[in-house]
C-alpha cells in the first residue's frame, strides 16, 4: 500500500522537477557554456577557456562594482535588522491593533520593484518631489541625480522603506512563538526589559533572524530593478552595483562571454557567503 502511494506521489512530483530543471538548470548550463567561449553571432563560437574569468577577476570595473555591492548590503543589514526588530517589539500581540499593524507592514512588500523605483524617483526629485523639495527648503543642497552621496542616501532610504517590513514580520513571528512561561519566570526573577530581550527574546529568535539575514543579504546583494529605475547606476557610476554592471555588459555592450563569467562569479559569491554565514550560525546553535 505504501509503495503504491509513493509511486503515485512521484507521479505528481516529476512534473515539478522537470519544470525546475527547465527554468534553472538549462539556463545555468547555457551561461556556463557562454563563459568559456566567444560568440560571433549566428551560433558561431570560439573556445576561450578561462580567459573571461581571468579578465573579470583582474578588472578594476568589476572590483569597483563588487565593492559598491558589498558596501550597500552591509549598510542595509546594519539599518534594517535593528530597525525591524525594534518595530516588531513595539507591535501589539493581541487586540484589533494586530491585523492593522500586519496589514500596514505588508503593504510595502506587495508593491512591484519597478513601481517602487518610479515612486521614489518622483518622491526624491529635487524640485517637485516631496523629499527633495523638503530637504532643499531646510538648507540641504540635495540632488540625487547629480550628487553621488545623495544618490546613495536615496537608494538606501528606498530599500529600507521597501524591505524593512520583511524583517519586522519575521521578527514579530519569532516573538510570538516564545512561550509565555519564559516571560513569567523572568518577571518572578525581577529581570529588566533589557535582560528579557538579551537572554530570552534574542536567543529564541535566532533561527528567524538567521532567515531574515540570509534573505536580506541575498535580496540586497542582487538588487537591480529599484536602483535601475531610480538612478540608472548614476550619477556617473556612483550606484552602479554589480547587478547593474552585469546587465550593462551583457545587454548594453553585448559582451556575452565576459558577462557570463561575471554572472557565474556573482552566483558563486552569493552561494559562498550564504553557506559561510549559515554554517557559522548552525555551529553556534549546536554549542547552545
Regions found by a protein language model. Name each.
Residues 2-288:
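A structural signal for multi-pass alpha-helical bundles of membrane permease subunits
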